[in-house]
Amino acid sequence: LREAVAKAPFMVAGTGRFDTRVMERLHERVFCKVGAEGVYCAALPGQGLGVAIKIDDGNNARAAEVVMAAVIEALVPLLADEPALLRSLSEPTLRNWNGIEVGRLRASAALRGALSAQSAAGAV
C-alpha cells in the first residue's frame, strides 16, 4: 500500500491537500490520511510508529493537520528542503475574506516540547 501511495499520492486526497503534499515530498517515509470529523492517522514506518489524532475544532481537519505536521516534523528525519514544507503546514496563515492576514494556527509550545523530548530521548 505504501509503495502504491508513494507512486500516486494524489489518489489519496487530491490536488494541494495536506495528505498529498506530505506524501509527494516524503514518499514512503510517511503515510497519512485524514478521516471524518478531525481524525488524522499516519504511519511512520522508519520509526516503527503509528499516529492517531482526534481534534474537534469545528473545522474538521484544520487543527489536526497542524498537529500532524508538527508530529512529522519532529519525528521523521528530514532532507534539506523538507522542514520548510512541514513548517508551512504546521503554521498556516489565516486570512479573512479580503485576503488580509488575521492570524496563524500553530502547535502549542507544550506539544512541540513533548515531541522534541521524545525525539531527543530516542524513544522513536
PLM feature spans:
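Structured C-terminal helix/loop/strand segments within mature extracytoplasmic catalytic/sensor domains
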Residues: 1-124
